[in-house]
């Protein structure tokens, strides 16, 4: 997929953590199209390996993963790096949002994914992170 040019927008290093293959492919493709550099993991173990090896400006993650919770990933990520965490989940109840915030998620978006909303969130966090002009 060709990368779109959005003048003045920051390029972010984003880790996408999503166990559903089709959703992961759509997310990585679209975020890459927006001009961001994307790494993708499908479980807690691979997400933690990425965090040990690379700096990220943001993590966009499903909460429920096959080998644990993304809350574990976010806690570790926030210990290691200054980044913004975006939860993507089908669970939008207050208790779920609170649990995500307690773990360190900065934003909580519900599925099905509203890509315009996700893009708006990323545009808001770009100036606060170390992205580069696209």
Range-by-range predicted roles:
Residues 111:
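A Lys-centered signature of the CheY-like receiver
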Residues 49, 71-82, 122:
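Short amphipathic alpha-helix used as the core "switch/output" element in two-component signaling
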Residues 1-21, 28, 116-134:
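Non-catalytic signal-transmission and effector/linker regions of two-component phosphorelay proteins
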Residues 72, 92-107, 120:
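Alpha4 helix (beta4-alpha4-beta5 surface) of REC/receiver domains from two-component response regulators
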Residues 62, 89:
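Active-site residues of response regulator receiver
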Residues 21-39:
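Two-component/phosphorelay signaling modules centered on CheY-like receiver
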Residues 43, 69-72:
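Acidic catalytic/metal-coordinating carboxylates
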Residues 40-58, 98:
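Acidic, metal-coordinating helix/loop segments flanking the phosphotransfer/catalytic sites
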């Amino acid at each position: 997929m060709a990368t779109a040019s959005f003048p003045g927008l920051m390029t972010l290093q984003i880790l996408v953590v999503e166990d559903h293959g089709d959703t992961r492919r759509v997310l990585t493709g679209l975020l890459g199209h927006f001009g961001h550099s994307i790494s993708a993991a499908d479980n807690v173990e691979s997400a933690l390996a990425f965090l040990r090896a690379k700096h990220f400006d943001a993590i966009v993650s499903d909460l429920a993963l096959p080998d644990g919770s993304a809350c574990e990933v976010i806690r570790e990520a926030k210990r290691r790096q200054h980044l913004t965490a975006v939860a993507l989940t089908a669970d939008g109840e207050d208790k779920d949002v609170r649990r995500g915030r307690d773990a360190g998620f900065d934003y909580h978006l519900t599925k099905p994914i509203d890509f315009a909303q996700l893009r708006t969130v990323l545009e808001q966090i770009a100036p606060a992170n170390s992205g580069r002009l696209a």
